[in-house]
Amino acid sequence: MAKVVKVSFGWRIPEFPVNGQPVGQEFITQVLKSLETVEGEFDSAWLSDHVIPWASWQNPSTDNLEGWSALNYFMGMFKRLSFGHVVLCNSFRNPGLLAKMAATLSVLSSGRFILGIGAGWKGDEYNSYGYDFEGFR
């Protein structure tokens, strides 16, 4: 007999308006309406961890949501979704502190936080906040 495997689907939360407008209440309302629509239909929702827009077509001075704070905000409102980042940049936060933050959020959300960590790749993003960027090795 074949083993049944559950497939999970996640929805990517935009962290900046694609029209270049500032992040404001109108944008947040659109995101909240989208999350209301996907809750119960998708298993998870995901945000990126960028301090400036990641998209090469987007003006780097475009306002965007900071991923950790925004994820905590949305997670508190939508109890039937798991949440995670695609992905957290390992050099934006001290590793020990990040582990504590992730463990705390996991406990507070009854295990709905999904931790994903990546290397970071956007040199101009590092430079804009004064972080060291050595590139890939």
Where are these regions (language model features)?
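Glycine-rich, flexible loop/turn motifs
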Residues: 64, 77, 88, 122-129
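Structural motif corresponding to the early beta-alpha repeats
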Residues: 72, 76, 82-94
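Short beta-strand segments at enzyme active-site cores
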Residues: 43-49, 83-85, 114-118
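Flexible, glycine-rich active-site loops centered on histidine and acidic residues
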Residues: 5-26, 92-137
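Glycine-rich "substrate-gating" loop/helix at the edge of Rossmann-like oxidoreductase active sites
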Residues: 58-65, 88-93, 132
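Short, charge-rich binding segments
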Residues: 2, 73-81, 104-110
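N-terminal beta1-alpha1-beta2 module of alpha/beta enzyme domains
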Residues: 1-77
